[in-house]
């Protein structure tokens, strides 16, 4: 039997309160090993939800963090990455300027995902983990999953491995502080 090729990649999430990066090695979906994980605090959500913009100071902070993450990737010899931003960037009026600045200053291309995809990705990962590592098959009647994030609340009903219903509300933990 042929041995699967070991690959490496970085997954970076630019969220409302943190920027996280996981470096991993993998041969497939069932064989993923986290090499290291970094987390940096940013107050992006509070700012965007209050002013509808990302300030120049916050942009600089994020650029510096991402430059550091890029350096760590170089040290590990990792070139492949996925960098996704969610609610705080998605709702910023100056989103395109921010994305352009990050690309020019760090070389990172940011994918801004919509709320439905953001929640779907989290739920798919959770369900897969429960089934493969938690020995927890989905109940026959389905399952209702709640995702409470900084920027929103998502409810997803899954039955027979299909999303039957999804509702997203703009009531997250950071928004409730406003």
Model-found features: residue ranges?
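Gly/Thr-rich phosphate-binding beta-strand-loop-beta motif of the actin/hexokinase/Hsp70
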Residues: 2-33, 126, 132, 136-169
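Conserved phosphate-binding loops in N-terminal lobes of ATP-dependent enzymes
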Residues: 5-110
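Hydrophobic residues at beta-strand termini and immediately following loops
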Residues: 40, 113, 169
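Residue-level detector of flexible, active-site-proximal loop/helix-junction positions
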Residues: 44, 117-119, 170-173
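Glycine-rich phosphate-binding loop plus the immediately following alpha-helix
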Residues: 49, 163-178
């Amino acid at each position: 039997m042929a041995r699967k090729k070991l690959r490496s990649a970085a997954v970076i999430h630019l969220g409302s309160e943190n920027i996280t990066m996981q470096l991993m090695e993998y041969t497939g979906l069932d064989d993923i090993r986290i090499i290291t994980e970094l987390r940096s605090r940013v107050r992006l959500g509070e700012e965007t939800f209050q002013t509808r913009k990302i300030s120049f100071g916050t942009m600089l902070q994020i650029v510096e963090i991402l430059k550091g993450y890029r350096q760590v990737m170089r040290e590990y010899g990792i070139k492949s990455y996925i960098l996704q931003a969610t609610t705080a960037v998605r709702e910023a009026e100056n989103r395109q300027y921010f994305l352009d600045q990050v690309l020019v200053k760090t070389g990172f291309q940011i994918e801004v995902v919509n709320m439905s995809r953001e929640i779907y990705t989290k739920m798919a990962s959770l369900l897969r983990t429960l089934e493969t590592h938690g020995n927890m098959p989905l109940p026959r009647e389905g399952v209702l999953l709640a995702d409470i994030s900084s920027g929103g609340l998502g409810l997803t009903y899954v039955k027979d491995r299909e999303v039957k219903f999804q509702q997203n509300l703009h009531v997250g933990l950071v928004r409730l502080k406003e």
